[in-house]
Design a protein with these regions (language model features):
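A short acidic, Gly/Pro-enriched loop at the edge of an enzyme's catalytic core
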Residues: 124-134
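Class I SAM-dependent methyltransferase SAM/SAH-binding core
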Residues: 65, 71-121
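A short glycine-rich, Lys/Arg-flanked "PGG" loop and its adjoining helix->strand segment in the class I
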Residues: 150-162
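Conserved beta-strand signature within the Rossmann-like core of class I S-adenosyl-L-methionine
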Residues: 163-170
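A short SAM/SAH-binding and catalytic strip from SAM-dependent methyltransferases
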Residues: 132-147
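Conserved class I S-adenosyl-L-methionine
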Residues: 2-57
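Core SAM-dependent methyltransferase catalytic element
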Residues: 195-208
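Short alpha-helix
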Residues: 174-186
């Protein structure tokens, strides 16, 4: 099993930032992304543990949904880890999706992007088909609302194929167990923390 993520990481999309993010500004998104390279290196251990937890052989042509994909850092890692996989990158920022298409150019033909706002009920209607794995990285916490987070998990469950999984690497607030409860209430089984420290965790469950 991979070692846990480096404690020096300062993940993006942190709602504790003093300056609010403007994900609809091309200038802001470009400047923000330029500062992410070191953080992306720091996240590699978390991404690797997430990939190892997906219950499919690396050679299989699985379909992955990255919720709040941003510029595609997690998608990039997973498409390299699963060389026959394809991915859908969902995000609520058109500018971030543009940046994701640019940064994922080496994976041309293996990914598509969907613009929808997961803080709004019904966001998943923009997606088609089902997925062996639905994943997310440092994104869902941004809604900063337990009710909305529960709604996101509820909409994710029908998207997952039986035998598949939902895995979320995110900043979380106490009480910690609420996150597991909400994932269970959405319908997932064998829900647990796969790793956590004082402010971040990798957690999720499986669809029987």
């Amino acid at each position: 099993m991979s070692k846990p993520p480096h404690s020096s990481e300062h993940p993006h999309h942190d709602h504790h930032d003093h300056n609010p993010h403007d994900w609809h500004s091309p200038e802001y998104v470009s400047k923000w992304a330029d500062g992410q390279d070191q953080k992306e290196l720091d996240r590699q251990d978390a991404f690797r543990l997430l990939a190892e937890t997906i219950p499919y052989d690396k050679s299989l042509p699985i379909r992955i949904l990255d919720v709040g994909a941003g510029y595609g850092a997690l998608t990039q890692f997973l498409l390299q880890y699963f060389p026959n996989a394809t991915a859908v990158c969902q995000d609520g920022s058109e500018e971030m999706i543009k940046l994701g298409r640019y940064r994922l150019a080496s994976q041309h033909g293996r990914f598509t992007c969907v613009l929808s706002n997961f803080s709004k009920s019904g966001w998943s209607r923009e997606l088609t088909g089902h997925f062996e794995a639905v994943v997310s990285s440092i994104a869902i916490h941004n809604v900063n609302s337990p009710n909305i987070i529960r709604g996101i998990y509820d909409e994710i469950f029908p998207l997952v194929k039986p035998g598949g999984c939902f895995l979320n690497y995110d900043l979380i607030q106490p009480p910690w167990e609420d996150q597991l409860k909400w994932v269970k209430q959405a319908g997932f089984a064998d829900v647990k923390f796969f790793w956590k420290d004082e402010r971040r965790a990798l957690f999720g469950g499986f669809k029987r």
